[in-house]
Curated annotation (Swiss-Prot):
Belongs to the peptidase C56 family. It comes from the Bacteria. InterPro entries: Class_I_gatase-like, DJ-1/PfpI, INH-QAR. It comes from Streptomyces lividans. Transmembrane segments: none annotated. Gene3D superfamilies: 3.40.50.880. GO terms for biological process: regulation of DNA-templated transcription. This is Uncharacterized protein in cpoL 5'region. Signal peptide: none annotated.
């Protein structure tokens, strides 16, 4: 019996770091060159394109509610996350997508989105070294 594709949803938002999307996307693409079967889908909370931290518009394949079944959720980071609260719409989107994923991960400051969604409670997590103390204060459990 052959396993089907491993579906990965990447949650993006305005101000996200483009590297936090392109880096993991390249890793999954390289894995596919060596026989893996990863399928990437870019998701924003409402399905709208988002503007990255460098001003580039990133289209979303769909919104969080309509996202297809997936195995892994990856939440990208953004420079503003450590310094300001995560919006409730983004937090709700992360929570909804995480509830349907077998594995949840974040890149860099994306951990702040997971924390705001209550997804770090009782778990160990890390973020960019400059923001570990802030993450620990915001997500003490």
């Amino acid at each position: 019996m052959t396993a089907g594709p491993h579906r990965v949803v990447v949650l993006v938002f305005d101000g996200m770091k483009l590297l936090d999307l392109s880096g993991p996307a390249e890793v999954f693409s390289e894995a596919n060159r060596f026989g893996a079967d990863y399928r990437l889908s870019i998701v924003s909370a409402d399905g709208s394109p988002v503007r990255s931290s460098i001003g580039m518009l990133v289209p979303a394949d769909t919104d969080a509610r309509a996202a297809a079944a997936h195995d892994t959720l990856v939440v990208v980071g953004g420079d503003a996350l450590p310094g300001s609260p995560v919006g409730p719409v983004l937090g709700a989107a992360a929570k909804e997508l995480a509830e349907r994923a077998g594995r949840v991960a974040s890149v860099c400051t994306g951990a702040f989105v997971l924390g705001a969604a209550g997804l770090l409670e009782g778990r160990r997590a890390t973020t960019h070294w400059q923001h570990t103390a802030t993450l620990a204060r915001r997500c003490p459990s």
